[in-house]
Amino acid sequence: MCIGIPMRVVVGSEFIAQCERHGAISSISLMLVGPQAPGTHLLTHLGSAIRVLDADEARAIDDALAGLAEAVEGRAFDMLFADLISREPELPPHLRGE
């Protein structure tokens, strides 16, 4: 399983951006997504941006990763999965058999 990490562009160039997550700065390749402006949210994996995110998507992914960390530590994590609590999961259209 691969895990994508949301990061925010601080300084971008044509092929590389300096991106921030929780105060840590990393150099991220932009070869798959093209040049991005400062403030843009990116989904990253192994030093490469793989998708541009909006702020809500970045926050939801960051919350999910924090929830996993809380679960591993044996702490409460429901508040970090607000989009999933109190609703039935839905199958994607291609699995519904409609």
Curated annotation (Swiss-Prot):
Coiled-coil blocks: none
InterPro entries named among the record's database cross-references: Hydgase_assmbl_chp_CS, Hydrogenase_HupF/HypC
Source taxon at top rank: Bacteria
GO molecular function annotations of the record: carbon dioxide binding; iron ion binding
Pfam families: HupF_HypC
Biological process according to GO: protein maturation
Sequence similarity: Belongs to the HupF/HypC family.
Name under which the protein is recorded: Hydrogenase expression/formation protein HupF
Taxonomic source organism: Rhizobium leguminosarum bv. viciae
